[in-house]
């Protein structure tokens, strides 16, 4: 059995595989983040009470989504009542398609293209995360999928890609990230939300909410037009309307 107070001065995990997944409320297949060739070194793992130095330092080297080299530096203080932490990292040579295993189940979108480099430097606590995010990318495009059929909505995809910055500038643009934690979710969900917001701001501009509102309005208009078109056809052939689509 584990005895307290607990202190592990040095912990190494080598050449392991780590999978993080979140269940969907509708019971569908969960999205997954995978980390292969996972190597971790943690120093000063402690249970807080009885120790002067309570800061934990963790270094990670792995392959994100099994393909992209990734390194992370993470530190936190077990004595801090707000669960303050800092975390920074870098991902290189990431095919955008590889993140669809996690993105698609939640957003009904697919991404394609090349993400050459991602850098993030965040700090946070039990309620929020914030910091800087930079990314170099090329030929990135988004496919919007129908929630039921999973087929691409080509018109909506085309509208979305008018907004997406397909290629990064010659000098990598830095965006500032700030997002809050879902209290029912883990630290890793909060970290992903920070990375996700950085991804959005890089691809569609810093005013993400305004851009998403614009796309939503276009989607509603397209949905209305589809509904009208479907109504007009029965009217001509049968002389009555049927509302086939719900929005």
What do the PLM-derived regions correspond to, one by one?
Residues 77, 90, 106-247:
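Extended terminal
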Residues 21, 68, 97, 128, ...:
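Residue-level signal for secondary-structure boundary sites
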Residues 1-87, 95:
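Elongated, acidic membrane-bridging lipid-handling scaffolds
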Residues 2, 20, 54-56, 69, ...:
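Generic, low-specificity signal for short hydrophobic/alpha-helical stretches with a mild N-terminal bias
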Residues 1-19, 89-124:
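Extended amphipathic, helix-rich lipid-handling scaffolds
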